[in-house]
């Protein structure tokens, strides 16, 4: 019952103390079903009352205990047909009433079982639908999460690619600047060296105090033992050199 209809629930019933088919084993009846079963007993009680009144008046017309002499002529006059007694009629009514009650209660029980089965099927269907919906939502969440992660990965890859391009451009620009600086520095160095060489070459000076220098050398060669005799020439030579230096500084200052 419920989710799988192939396996049925075993249901048994029995008589209670009032001989009503209301005791079930295997299923719990709701209060609504019990009330309906109680309502179904009301016509039966009326019929039982009428049957009881019939049995009360029956002994006057049909005595239940008659002697052999009383019953025998009656059977002879009717041609051998036996008339039903009051006790038999009451028992037959009671059995029919019990059977009708059994059928009504059985129909109510079957209706209740069908309702329970329908409710269990609906409950199982709702649970299955909820489970499918939950699984679908979980799948959608996982899919959205995967899409979000993939999008973030693409964004990070694009950012890394952009940074790589930026740093390559910066490195290339720095290399170009360094190369330009080196070229300018080399040109400036060569220009400065060339200018310095030209300035040095242009400054060709004649020897100063050549006459005094020759006189001193001659004096030293002649007075090897008495070089103090050449001291006056040495003083004049120093004065001449000092004057030439002052003149040079004044001209190029």
Curated annotation (Swiss-Prot):
Example GO CC term: the record gives: MICOS complex
| Residue positions of motif Cx9C motif 1 | 209-219
Motif span (Cx9C motif 2)?
230-240
Report the Pfam families cross-referenced here: MIC19_MIC25
Q: List the disulfide bonds.
A: 209-240, 219-230
Which residue(s) hold a covalent lipid per the annotation (N-myristoyl glycine)? 2
| Swiss-Prot/TrEMBL GO biological process terms | cristae formation; DNA damage response
Topological relation to the membrane, as annotated: Lipid-anchor
User: Taking the first listed entry, what is the main subcellular location of this protein, grouped into a coarse class?
Assistant: mitochondrion
Ranges annotated as biased composition (Basic and acidic residues): 28-44
Give the subcellular location.
Mitochondrion inner membrane
Give the record's keywords alphabetically.
Answer: Coiled coil, Disulfide bond, Lipoprotein, Membrane, Mitochondrion, Mitochondrion inner membrane, Myristate
- Coiled-coil residues: 94-178
Chain segments carrying region Disordered? 1-89
User: Which residue intervals define the domain CHCH in the entry?
Assistant: 206-248
Is Secreted among the key words of this record?
no
Q: Where is the composition biased (Low complexity)?
A: 48-64
InterPro entries xrefs: MIC19/MIC25, MIC25
By sequence similarity, the record places it as follows: Belongs to the MICOS complex subunit Mic19 family. Metazoan Mic25 subfamily.
Quaternary data: Component of the mitochondrial contact site and cristae organizing system (MICOS) complex (also known as MINOS or MitOS complex).
Described by its record, this protein's role is as follows: Component of the MICOS complex, a large protein complex of the mitochondrial inner membrane that plays crucial roles in the maintenance of crista junctions, inner membrane architecture, and formation of contact sites to the outer membrane.
- Name this protein carries in UniProt: MICOS complex subunit mic25
The organism named in the record is Xenopus tropicalis
């Amino acid at each position: 019952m419920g989710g799988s209809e192939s396996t049925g629930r075993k249901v048994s019933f029995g008589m209670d103390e009032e001989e009503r088919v209301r005791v079930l084993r295997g299923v719990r009846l709701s209060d609504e079903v019990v009330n309906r079963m109680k309502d179904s007993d009301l016509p039966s009680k009326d019929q039982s009352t009428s049957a009881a009144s019939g049995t009360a008046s029956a002994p006057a017309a049909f005595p239940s205990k008659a002697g052999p002499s009383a019953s025998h002529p009656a059977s002879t006059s009717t041609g051998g047909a036996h008339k039903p007694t009051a006790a038999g009629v009451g028992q037959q009514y009671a059995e029919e009433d019990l059977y009708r009650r059994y059928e009504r209660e059985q129909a109510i029980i079957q209706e209740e079982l069908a309702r329970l089965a329908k409710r269990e099927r609906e409950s199982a269907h709702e649970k299955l639908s909820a489970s499918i919906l939950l699984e679908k939502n979980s799948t959608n969440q996982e899919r959205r999460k995967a899409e979000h992660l993939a999008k973030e990965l693409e964004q990070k890859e694009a950012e890394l690619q952009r940074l790589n391009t930026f740093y390559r451009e910066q490195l290339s620009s720095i290399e170009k600047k360094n190369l330009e600086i080196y070229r300018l520095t080399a040109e400036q160095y060569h220009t400065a060296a060339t200018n310095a060489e030209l300035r040095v070459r242009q400054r060709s000076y004649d020897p100063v105090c050549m006459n005094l220098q020759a006189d001193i050398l001659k004096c030293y060669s002649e007075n090897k033992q008495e070089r103090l005799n050449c001291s006056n020439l040495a003083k004049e030579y120093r004065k001449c050199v000092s004057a030439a230096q002052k003149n040079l500084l004044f001209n190029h200052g």
